[in-house]
């Protein structure tokens, strides 16, 4: 997750492969400080543009596509019909390939599932942290500082900074090259900057344009291939459910204990507030990752643009906890339906509410059919069986995206409701579930990192300007609470 942990063996695509007669290749690429890292000492006049970029993970994915182009025919595949797809950080990486001139001709369709559309800050990556310890991107200089401290060369990061500033460029380069994998990962994950987002690509001007994905969309310099963008209705519940400020947790019992889980959710502390902040967090994510890029691409003539929203949330109640409200159509849940991996004790025990299993299987089959038809033809249409509701292209004037849900709820249908910033701000300003201060805190939290929120100017003028002078220390503490928990999980996986 987050371009920090994971490997190519996580997914089991056997159901997708067998049901749709496709070949699925899962690729391995460098992550964390090995995949995306910059330090001024690592480049010189002899460095290639690729080495200067810091986008080593992205270059790995490009190399993988070159290998596929050269070799997939030996596995029964077609090198002239390659579809790339990925979720979350993987969706971000698919977007990077879609926007990178170096990936031209290596793939022919793209599916971005819950991607992140913002990019890393080169300035932050190549400078020391400011005094408030806040930065949108991990700093290569600070990682070197933390290794100096961990080796006992410096007493603390301030002393390390003094030492590093006295080191020659070659000494810094040799020191970084001497660092072990464990040292680099530990330095990255320990005491990360406030406001840091997911590990993302650098807009270096070679692998990725200097203006990032937004420039590629607006200038229409993307790779001219059909694309699907999508998010899940309750993306943020995946993260908010782990936050003790929103959900009360206790030692596991019953099914949770049987599944080997130490802690279990007991109750949502304020359900209406929980639902409200999820709607806006997930809504602004949809705006930045789906609706805005789709609208801009279509405006610039990229007609083969499709979009979806995954809405399935018919989960069960476990030990008195309503998972359909706690988790809902959360981040990453659609992967289960794309891959069709339902034959698992934990999945069967935890996910499905009364009567929801067979409709969920049907939805999974339909999603696989759409994904495969898109891979075959560049248009998901009515699926490979030509029997599903028509998935139309994104239209700036009419219907825009396909809602993916089971027959127990909405089913599969097109929607014309676009999530613009104006639409979301209007909803937020009139939401009776939140006080004005809570509305300000919600918008601040959404805009704090990863580029899904609003500009400083828009924030300062929201609700007549009452938000700009409030104290958001508690909001930042709440954000950091879930970030700390997820970072600990990343360290354990690593």
How should each PLM-predicted stretch be described?
Residues 71-81, 150-157, 296-306, 373-393:
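Surface-exposed helix-capping loop/turn segments at secondary-structure junctions
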Residues 30-33, 85-89, 309-316, 386-395:
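Short, solvent-exposed turn/loop segments enriched in Gly/Ser/Thr/Pro and often Arg
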Residues 406-432:
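Extracellular/periplasmic bilobal clamshell ligand-binding domains
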Residues 109, 117, 121-127, 158-361, ...:
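Substrate-gating cap/lid region and adjacent catalytic-acid/histidine neighborhood
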Residues 1-58, 79, 347-367, 378-384, ...:
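Non-catalytic accessory segments of hydrolases
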Residues 1-165, 206, 214-241, 302:
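Serine-hydrolase-like catalytic core of hydrolytic proteins
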Residues 59-66, 92, 134, 138-142, ...:
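A structural signal for well-ordered alpha-helical segments within the folded catalytic domains
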Residues 390-410:
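C-terminal, flexible cofactor-proximal segment of oxidoreductases
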């Amino acid at each position: 997750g987050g371009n920090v942990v994971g490997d190519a063996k996580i997914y089991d695509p056997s159901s997708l492969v067998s049901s749709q007669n496709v070949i699925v290749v899962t690729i391995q690429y460098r992550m964390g400080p090995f995949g995306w890292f910059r330090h001024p000492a690592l480049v010189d006049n002899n460095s290639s543009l690729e080495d200067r970029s810091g986008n080593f993970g992205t270059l790995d994915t490009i190399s993988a596509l070159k290998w596929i182009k050269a070799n997939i025919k030996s596995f029964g595949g077609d090198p002239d019909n390659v579809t790339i797809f990925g979720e979350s950080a993987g969706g971000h990486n698919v977007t990077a390939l879609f926007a990178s001139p170096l990936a031209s001709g290596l793939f022919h369709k793209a599916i971005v599932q819950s991607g992140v559309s913002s990019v890393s800050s080169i300035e932050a990556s190549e400078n020391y942290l400011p005094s408030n310890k806040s930065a949108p991107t991990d700093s290569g200089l600070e990682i070197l500082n933390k290794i100096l401290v961990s080796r006992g060369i410096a007493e603390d990061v301030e002393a390390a900074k003094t030492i590093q500033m006295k080191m020659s460029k070659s000494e810094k380069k040799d020191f970084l090259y001497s660092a072990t994998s464990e040292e680099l990962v530990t330095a990255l994950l320990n005491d990360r900057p406030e406001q840091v987002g997911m590990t993302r690509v650098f807009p270096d001007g070679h692998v990725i344009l200097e203006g990032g994905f937004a420039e590629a969309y607006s200038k229409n310099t993307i790779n001219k291939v059909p694309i699907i963008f999508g998010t899940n209705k309750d993306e943020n519940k995946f993260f908010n459910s782990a936050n003790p400020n929103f959900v009360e947790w206790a030692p596991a019992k019953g099914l949770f204990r049987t599944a080997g889980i130490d802690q279990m959710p007991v109750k949502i502390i304020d359900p209406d507030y929980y639902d409200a902040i999820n709607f806006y967090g997930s809504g602004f994510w949809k705006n930045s990752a789906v609706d805005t890029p789709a609208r801009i691409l279509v405006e610039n003539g990229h007609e083969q643009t499709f979009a979806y929203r995954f809405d399935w949330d018919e989960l069960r109640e476990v030990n008195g906890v309503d998972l359909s409200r706690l988790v809902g159509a959360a981040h990453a849940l659609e992967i289960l339906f794309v891959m069709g991996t339902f034959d698992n004790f934990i999945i069967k025990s935890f996910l499905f509410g009364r009567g929801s299993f067979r409709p969920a299987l049907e939805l999974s089959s339909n999603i696989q059919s759409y994904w495969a038809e898109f891979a075959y033809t560049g248009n998901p249409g009515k699926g490979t069986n030509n029997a599903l509701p028509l998935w139309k292209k994104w239209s700036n004037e009419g219907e825009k995206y396909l809602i993916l849900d089971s027959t127990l709820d909405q089913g599969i249908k097109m929607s014309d409701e676009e999530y613009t910033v104006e639409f979301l701000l209007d909803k937020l300003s009139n939401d009776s579930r939140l006080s004005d201060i809570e509305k300000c805190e919600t918008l601040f939290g959404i805009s704090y990192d990863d580029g899904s929120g609003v500009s400083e100017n828009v924030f300062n003028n929201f609700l007549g300007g009452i938000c700009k002078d409030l104290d958001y220390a508690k909001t930042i503490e709440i954000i950091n609470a879930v970030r700390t928990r997820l970072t600990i999980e990343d360290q354990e996986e690593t």
